[in-house]
């Protein structure tokens, strides 16, 4: 689909740590509509930084609808949507790919103790991880979060059928893929 006079318009969506923004641009770089919404970052303990995937999904739907509605009022139809999200989030998912718990964000450091133990007791593993990924072993990465989940929330880990990020969750929610 394209918009008026063949002018391509794309909606860019940026899902951040505490809010989401959507903006529609013509190929020429002219902005045609924008919206933003916010959601809370929960820090129930100094080493925890969590969010509810349902709140992020609702906020994302809200801003995309606002921008799409504004474009419709201008007689324009978006050509597509580009999605960018925060990195290193972790959501335990059930068999239907629905969240089983709040999302651990990139800022969640509850797995720091596991990382410390790995660095002390398994330096070769940490070196291999770095050589393969280009990333040092760190509490922000999903691997450390998964290990923490397995060791500290074994009942939740046992019910978890998939592990996803916020981007995975949104793609699944919007496309059922």
Mark where each language-model region is.
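Glycine-rich phosphate-binding/catalytic subdomain of phosphoryl-transfer
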Residues: 65-177
């Amino acid at each position: 689909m394209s918009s008026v006079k063949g002018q391509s318009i794309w909606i860019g969506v940026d899902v951040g740590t505490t809010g989401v923004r959507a903006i529609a641009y013509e190929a020429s770089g002219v902005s045609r509509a924008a919206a933003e919404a916010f959601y809370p970052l929960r820090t129930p303990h100094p080493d925890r930084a969590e969010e509810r995937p349902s709140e992020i999904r609702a906020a994302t739907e809200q801003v995309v609808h606002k921008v799409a509605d504004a474009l419709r009022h201008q007689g324009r139809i978006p050509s597509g949507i580009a999605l960018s999200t925060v990195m290193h989030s972790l959501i335990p998912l059930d068999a239907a790919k629905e969240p089983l718990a709040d999302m651990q964000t990139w800022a969640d450091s509850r797995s720091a103790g596991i990382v410390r133990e790995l660095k002390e007791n398994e330096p070769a593993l940490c070196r291999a991880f770095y050589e393969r990924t280009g990333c040092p072993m760190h509490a922000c990465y999903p691997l450390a979060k998964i290990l923490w989940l397995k060791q500290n929330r074994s009942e939740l880990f046992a019910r978890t059928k998939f592990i996803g990020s916020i981007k995975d969750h949104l793609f699944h929610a919007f496309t059922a893929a």
